[in-house]
């Protein structure tokens, strides 16, 4: 099986300034995200070894490690695509209509998503996801890298609320970081994810 790899970014580290500094993006991508990639590959190797040895305790441990590091890799891979130096503004098309229908307006959605981000205790993410069973949009808090997300949810938009994502620039004022985040949201990417989620997941879990 192929190893997990660190994805290249579609923009330079400094391209999201002044909203997210180049220093943060370089450390975030080349160190933090890279560590999750190494962690998931290490966990897979150790899991294979544990299975070969019939070591159930090691299997369970490395399955937990795999979930954490793979969660980190997936979340960050979405994160980089969710951002763009040409971002900001508001969504259009089917996604905009769904947001208006299910949240009342874009402003109400933005307020709910922002509250989820600012209110998160400890480390994690705020997420806009598509519920493939209920055919609806949801916002929720993802704890750490892998907890509190029901199966069947397709992530569309995420904001990283781990301190490594903002502390060098915004210190402990994470509300300013979340406010700045909206200026670089790549709505084209989010809309493409929504289109794929609504067209490709029907019957995926329940036939």
UniProtKB/Swiss-Prot annotation:
KW Cell cycle (keyword) present: no
Which EC numbers does the record give? 1.15.1.1
As to how many cofactors bind and how, the note says: Binds 1 Mn(2+) ion per subunit.
Q: Which residues bind Mn(2+)?
A: 28, 76, 160, 164
Reactions catalysed = 2 superoxide + 2 H(+) = H2O2 + O2
One Pfam family it belongs to: Sod_Fe_C
Family to which the UniProt record says this protein belongs = Belongs to the iron/manganese superoxide dismutase family.
Function as written in the Swiss-Prot or TrEMBL entry: Destroys superoxide anion radicals which are normally produced within the cells and which are toxic to biological systems.
Q: What is this protein called?
A: Superoxide dismutase [Mn]
Give the encoding gene's name. Answer: sodA
